[in-house]
């Protein structure tokens, strides 16, 4: 995994940096951490329904998965967020 700062955000890549290798963006905010994930809504396992229904088209516009968002506001949410990040990592090439 490779990380790269981008303004106030951190981009996470599987291997080398590049659009197709990017699998998540961490956005640090006053009220918590917002994470944009590369996701396949047909195979994503999200029993707690954290993933927003809205699809974004800012960071992941290469046709490999959709851009979805989760928010972390409590320490206790980190373990579940990591499970969602692992699924997103698997979609990056």
What are the functions of these language-model segments?
Residues 57-93:
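Well-ordered alpha/beta subsegment
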Residues 5-68:
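Short, conserved beta-strand/beta-arch hydrophobic-aromatic motifs that form part
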């Amino acid at each position: 995994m490779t990380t790269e700062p981008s303004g106030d955000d951190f981009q996470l890549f599987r291997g080398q940096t590049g659009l197709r290798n990017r699998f998540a963006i961490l956005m640090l905010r006053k009220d918590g951490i917002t994470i944009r994930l590369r996701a396949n809504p047909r195979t994503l396992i999200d029993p707690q329904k954290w993933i927003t229904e809205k699809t974004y088209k800012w960071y992941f516009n290469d046709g490999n998965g959709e851009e979805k968002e989760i928010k972390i506001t409590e320490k206790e949410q980190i373990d579940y967020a990591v499970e969602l990040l692992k699924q997103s990592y698997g979609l990056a090439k």
